[in-house]
Amino acid sequence: MSAKAAEGYEQIEVDVVAVWKEGYVYENRGSTSVDQKITITKGMKNVNSETRTVTATHSIGSTISTGDAFEIGSVEVSYSHSHEESQVSMTETEVYESKVIEHTITIPPTSKFTRWQLNADVGGADIEYMYLIDEVTPIGGTQSIPQVITSRAKIIVGRQIILGKTEIRIKHAERKEYMTVVSRKSWPAATLGHSKLFKFVLYEDWGGFRIKTLNTMYSGYEYAYSSDQGGIYFDQGTDNPKQRWAINKSLPLRHGDVVTFMNKYFTRSGLCYDDGPATNVYCLDKREDKWILEVVG
């Protein structure tokens, strides 16, 4: 497991899609051999040079949803060809290096050359030429097509946030400051600060999500709600409908997710930064700032 896994991330193994397909085909119908120069790119297409993070364009089982961010640790595929079973794998370096390979092959007369390429799809990340098999057959002859048996990938994702249990920090995506709790008007209230000591737990019930502080200075006053003026305070009990929030991401939530919180009572108002007289976390009309969820520990 990478060092990154200790910082709120974990490595998990998932089933992925892998297929063999014709990467290059040439029929030499002449009476002499023919040389052909072939150029291939092995590894991931469209690699971001600044980060190895991939954004899923489709789900991976129940683990990764569309839009989730992850990194690829390795890919492993077992396959059968010519009545034999084999296994091939790509390391993290091989996946991301996008290596260009050039070489020349010689095709005998009256023969068909087929290059079978093994491609893998990991949440929309297209990994080409994991492996290749070159086959020469008579033109019109029977080919031995390789078949995938199993295909798995190790991916690095944010640790899952278990509702009602996992302690998190909530960070303003633009300002890079954390939600903290201070006393205002003899109530615990939310404001931004640089301290990482303030922890929260997310809950979900019939009315939406609730945000519980673990750092209230008034016993029992712990669920974030929007006042009529838009200030964010922490309330007793769970009956107040202004405590309910909608999160713009499907479950499961994970470390590093960037989300918005829209109030379920003031339905057009979202959790946001605003430079108020004493605190600066508000729920305001037609506002929905982005917040980063960070797993604690």
UniProtKB/Swiss-Prot annotation:
What does this chain do? Pore-forming toxin that defensively acts against parasitic microorganisms by forming pores in sphingomyelin-containing membranes. Has hemolytic activity and is also cytotoxic to spermatozoa of some species of invertebrates and many species of vertebrates and to amphibian larvae, guinea pig polymorphonuclear leukocytes, chicken fibroblasts, normal spleen cells and various tumor cells. Is lethal for various species of reptiles, amphibian, birds and mammals. Induces smooth muscle contraction.
Record protein name field: Lysenin
Entry's family note: Belongs to the lysenin family.
Where it sits in the cell: the answer is: Secreted; Target cell membrane
Biotechnology section? This toxin represents an excellent tool for visualizing distribution and dynamics of sphingomyelin in cells.
Listed as disulfide-bonded, the cysteine pairs are: C272-C283
- Fill in the subunit field for this protein: Binds to sphingomyelin as a monomer by using its C-terminal domain. Forms a nonamer when sphingomyelin/lysenin ratio is lower than ca 500. Oligomerization, but not binding, is influenced by the fluidity of sphingomyelin.
Site description Crucial for binding sphingomyelin and inducing hemolysis, residues in chain: W20, W245, W291
Q: Where is this site: Crucial for binding sphingomyelin and important for inducing hemolysis?
A: W187
Give the residues the record marks as binding an N-(acyl)-sphingosylphosphocholine: K185, S227, Y233, Y282
What Gene3D superfamilies would the database entry show?
2.60.120.980, 2.80.10.50
| Region: Beta-hairpin domain, residue numbers | 34-107
Effect seen on changing W291A: Loss of ability to bind sphingomyelin, and to induce hemolysis
Q: What is the effect of changing Y26A?
A: In double Tyr mutant; almost complete loss of ability to bind sphingomyelin and to lyse cells
Q: Which GO terms describe its biological process?
A: defense response to bacterium; killing of cells of another organism; monoatomic ion transport
- Using the UniProt annotation, give all residue ranges assigned to the region (C-terminal receptor-binding domain): 157-297
> Origin, by domain of life?
Eukaryota
Outcome (variant: W245A): Loss of ability to bind sphingomyelin, and to induce hemolysis
Q: Where is this region: N-terminal cap domain?
A: 10-33, 108-156
Q: Where expressed (tissue)?
A: Expressed by coelomocytes.
Signal peptide start-end: none
